[in-house]
């Protein structure tokens, strides 16, 4: 006959084992649900879109015009073309992930004041642009805008500019062509870096439907490359920009400016940034 204490201990350990297994199962189930939700809504994190009606009227200082392209059925691409009074060329500006040209169009003055036109597209689902989102579609759209621009501007008078998410469009475009220069503000080597920084507890590599492998595309770039990044960037880790810079071919002119107190969206506020950008816009080198 078993000792009563043994029976009590056996029952206790069985209870603990059952509770532990039940807890682990519940945690695993919850983790799976979180992963599923992340996979389902990730576009809302990556692309913070703001739509505008086709009839919306922009109001910016200086001359500008709207450009509409329809490269495929059910796809409408929209951009603003800002004109400088005495032009040195055109900056093809790929903006960040949030808002629309209603917000980003204000940035054009930074270039037009220095004699550069600015062609600034909205991505699919942003502003007046329409179409189904995918990484391949965004890359194709960026190429369409570059091709359109080369019909109006010589390639050696085009600077491709990518701001944060916009680097994911700017780098492949520059890699496939021969613009005057490639300028990247707060860029990433790939989107996995940003995801790891924000969602490190999730299997982000398996869940992400967007990679934006700038670190691979930039190896094919033949024009000068200028990278600006803040060490305190809470969205795109500084180390990601370092990896991107390391991937730039040694055969091209390259420079990386680090801002010790810089965050993600404040780099234009630094005098050093403005000074170097003035040099780039003045010489393209």
Language model: regions and residue ranges:
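Membrane-embedded segments
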Residues: 72-148, 163, 167-168, 174
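C-terminal catalytic histidine-bearing segment of alpha/beta-hydrolase fold enzymes
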Residues: 243, 250-285
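Active-site nucleophile loop of the alpha/beta-hydrolase fold
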Residues: 179, 183-193, 210-214, 262
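Alpha/beta-hydrolase fold nucleophile elbow
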Residues: 153-164
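Short alpha-helix in the alpha/beta-hydrolase fold that links the catalytic acid
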Residues: 107, 214, 223, 237-246
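Acidic catalytic loop of the alpha/beta-hydrolase fold
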Residues: 232-236, 264-265
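Short beta-strand/loop motif that positions the catalytic acidic residue
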Residues: 220-221, 227-229, 233
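An N-terminal hydrophobic leader/cap segment in hydrolases
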Residues: 23-70
